[in-house]
């Protein structure tokens, strides 16, 4: 009996197949600091530090930034050519995106007519209204659309149209193909130079006119600005410059900014004088003598305004005002206004150097006359036969208890303007007369002419002082007159 032997091969059932471990990539061999990036295949450095290996097939990226002019530090594969350009992976990606976007822009979208033709196939007519001819034409139209080839002419876009100069004299495109020297003339070198010179002179005059126009616009706008500022100042007053008291923080900041703007680029002192000289020299060099005269006249005009009209008088040297309006300059100290009188005030400027309180010629006070000529008084006959009461006695000349001697200098006789011969009151008895003469004056009448001759030379220089001292013994009741009535006196 034949036996069949079956050989059973051992199976791996129940055994765990070991998973092959993948070798971990080695890290970068950068020596300056540890780098955890994996090495490139066949290299010892990563893509970031591969340039440390001079034999590696890599070089620095050729991209240069347009902002700062620096070159990209990343590594890029070496090109086949020695002087070839190669970029890193990042800049290659950016170039691809930029190229793709540019292709999208250059490729025009579907034209409106093409879209209408494509959609017109869906516009079917109503059922029952189709005829064999219309159905035949519809079929032929569909076949025509299907046979549309890309090689046919595309519709013209706006960018592809001819751009001509609308102000040119050309009437058609064919004019560009004509001879440009068709209407040209034949000139010599001297004639060409003269023509070019005339053109340059004309161009220069046009530029000068344009510059003058700009200057006129600047002056006009400045005038409007000053007028508006004056109106605003009259309407609002000087409330902005009263001080930071009672203002909010924002208002204080605005006030500070306004003050800074007012003195922004404003020149002072020597700098202002030099700047003015520079402007005058520039205007003299550009515009000539006529402009110099105009500049001199305009710069020497007074800055004062009378009834909104500028004063046309010439200003004083080193000032901006004339002699009439010089007192409007608060910084000057050489002139003062005339005070005038109480009835008619006067504001005419007068130099301070003339006197401490200057006055104009109309209100000038004359000094007292230094020389007084001698006057021979004629005594009328009626005065010689006058009564004895006209003269005072020595007892009346003495100071009384009611009026002390210290107040005698302040007496002033009212009514001293009447014409009469000098009285013995004009002389001091204690100074000019002896004691016996005083007694004679008390008993007998005074010889007026004799006393005048005797005390003329000695008492004329002391007339004012003696008159004040002689009026001291007057009593409070007054001076006795010829009628026996007391004459009133006053204390000044």
Swiss-Prot record:
Chain spans, region Disordered: 126-182, 455-492
Keyword field: Chromatin regulator, Isopeptide bond, Mitochondrion, Nucleus, Phosphoprotein, Ubl conjugation
Record's compositionally biased regions (Acidic residues): 167-178
Record keyword Mitochondrion present: yes
GO biological process entries: chromatin organization; positive regulation of DNA-templated transcription
Residue numbers bearing the Phosphothreonine modification: 131
Cross-link Glycyl lysine isopeptide (Lys-Gly) (interchain with G-Cter in SUMO2): where in chain: 78
Subcellular location: Nucleus; Mitochondrion
Pfam families, per database record: zf-C3Hc3H
InterPro entries for the chain: NSL2, Potential_DNA-bd
Entry GO CC: actin cytoskeleton; cytosol; histone acetyltransferase complex; mitochondrion; NSL complex; nucleoplasm; plasma membrane
Region (Required for interaction with other NSL complex members): 308-364
Modified residues annotated as Phosphoserine in this record: 147, 149, 168, 172, 175
Main location: nucleus
Subunit structure as annotated in this protein's UniProt entry: Component of the NSL complex at least composed of KAT8/MOF, KANSL1, KANSL2, KANSL3, MCRS1, PHF20, OGT1/OGT, WDR5 and HCFC1.
Function description: Non-catalytic component of the NSL histone acetyltransferase complex, a multiprotein complex that mediates histone H4 acetylation at 'Lys-5'- and 'Lys-8' (H4K5ac and H4K8ac) at transcription start sites and promotes transcription initiation. Required for NSL complex stability and for transcription of intraciliary transport genes in both ciliated and non-ciliated cells by regulating histone H4 acetylation at 'Lys-5'- and 'Lys-12' (H4K5ac and H4K12ac). This is necessary for cilium assembly in ciliated cells and for organization of the microtubule cytoskeleton in non-ciliated cells.
The protein, known as: KAT8 regulatory NSL complex subunit 2
Organism the protein comes from: Homo sapiens
Gene: KANSL2
